């Protein structure tokens, strides 16, 4: 084990690109996107003399945390946190009607910066590889078992939702409302459907792409279709797209340059602006960039207001609160929708840093960030030491979940803990101690 801290030309290039990306985020928000969500509280970002020096320093810190390329699971997680979470939390902070005076050195922006810094530093720990690669036969047997369990759960979901199952685009929100009753959060149906699909299919699909095995490819697509028909979820299709591109690229080159990821997102921002200028409306802005950057930045402003009004929640909405005799209250995401947006049916999903801040302030953020950091170390260890390539899609699954859910929900309800356990089982040489004994 060793710690890598290296600065080269790629870091300088990424600093420039991240600065351009952050600056473009402010420009696009103020001129093209914020008005698409102003009915919920989004606003223009205040631009003053100190903004651009701040963005340059922020870009340098983010470039140092990301490094030059995505080579390991932890690199993927940190890079996605930087290019998705930083823009709406530390660049567009204050671009809302709930906390217009929010600064990066206070409140939820500071909590998020603190958490990303912890995870980014932990990710600098490196491990020397061993001669033996991942146990192929052991891994294949586990994948077959997962695929069988996944198919059983898909059949279960289909029959439970048969009364309203549909691929109709207009009825997606109605299906979501019905699914909340049929597959209620915290119920056996809810846990089974969530873990049996959303935890399994990214790994199965990734294996199919990487090994060119059509069965797992088709199974991943079937999962996305079932989740769309039963739950009205578009998220699985985005995950399939990301996994396919990532696995194909990794299969060919073995790494992804961070500069290319930043350039791709920068081009999306500019394409959205160009589409608006040419057609007077941008589908890209409305259906992708608004959801990726403007909606979460507005919700984080609401988080700051919530904490200032109600203080810390002390995990009263979790099983921990029930075990401590406090009683289990309404989930924070729904309480945020009720108290700040006056909509009791609104599930105001925010990232796990923000949830931890609402639960226990900076102490909660530090504790949960260390848990995520520990998971990063485990995935990096298995990947570097034992060649556990499946840690890459697990890291992608982990990241996409913590961007909009609490850590406890991600680990247990979304099955990430189970996938980490599965990853360890197919990676560690389980028969080593038995062989030595004999």
Swiss-Prot record:
Q: Domain of life here?
A: Bacteria
Which segments cross the bilayer? 15-31, 46-65, 74-90, 107-123, 148-164, 201-217, 220-236, 239-255, 258-274, 317-335, 342-358, 361-377, 399-418, 421-437
Where in or outside the cell is it found?
A: Cell inner membrane
Keywords carried by this UniProt record: Cell inner membrane, Cell membrane, Lipopolysaccharide biosynthesis, Membrane, Transferase, Transmembrane, Transmembrane helix
Segments on the Cytoplasmic side according to the record's topology features: 1-14, 66-73, 124-147, 218-219, 256-257, 336-341, 378-398, 438
Phenotype for residue 304 to A = Does not affect B-band LPS biosynthesis
* Intervals, Periplasmic compartment: 32-45, 91-106, 165-200, 237-238, 275-316, 359-360, 419-420
Effect of deleting the gene: Knockout mutants express B-band LPS containing complete core plus one 0-repeat unit. Mutants are still producing A-band LPS.
Substituting residue 311 to V results in:
Does not affect B-band LPS biosynthesis
Q: In which pathway does it act?
A: Bacterial outer membrane biogenesis; LPS O-antigen biosynthesis
Mutation: residue 176 to A/K; reported impact is:
Abolishes B-band LPS biosynthesis
Q: What is its EC number?
A: 2.4.99.27
What reaction does this enzyme carry out catalytically? n lipid-linked O-antigen repeat units = a lipid-linked O antigen + (n-1) polyisoprenyl diphosphate
Instruction: State a single Gene Ontology molecular function.
Output: glycosyltransferase activity
Signal peptide positions (record): none
Q: Which BP terms in the Gene Ontology apply to this protein?
A: Gram-negative-bacterium-type cell outer membrane assembly; lipopolysaccharide biosynthetic process; O antigen biosynthetic process
Top-level EC class, please? transferase
Changing residue 175 to K does what?
Answer: Does not affect B-band LPS biosynthesis
Effect on the protein upon substituting residue 291 to A/K = Abolishes B-band LPS biosynthesis
Topology versus the membrane: Multi-pass membrane protein
Q: Which GO terms describe its cellular component?
A: Gram-negative-bacterium-type cell wall; membrane; periplasmic side of plasma membrane; plasma membrane
Q: Which cysteines are joined by disulfide bonds?
A: none
In the record, the effect of residue 279 to A is given as:
Does not affect B-band LPS biosynthesis
Q: What is the effect of changing residue 186 to V?
A: Does not affect B-band LPS biosynthesis
What does this protein do, in the record's words? Polymerase involved in the biosynthesis of the B-band lipopolysaccharide (LPS). Catalyzes the polymerization of the O-antigen repeat units on the periplasmic face of the inner membrane, leading to the formation of the lipid-linked O-antigen molecule.
* Full protein name: O-antigen polymerase
Native organism: Pseudomonas aeruginosa (strain ATCC 15692 / DSM 22644 / CIP 104116 / JCM 14847 / LMG 12228 / 1C / PRS 101 / PAO1)
Q: Tell me the gene name.
A: wzy
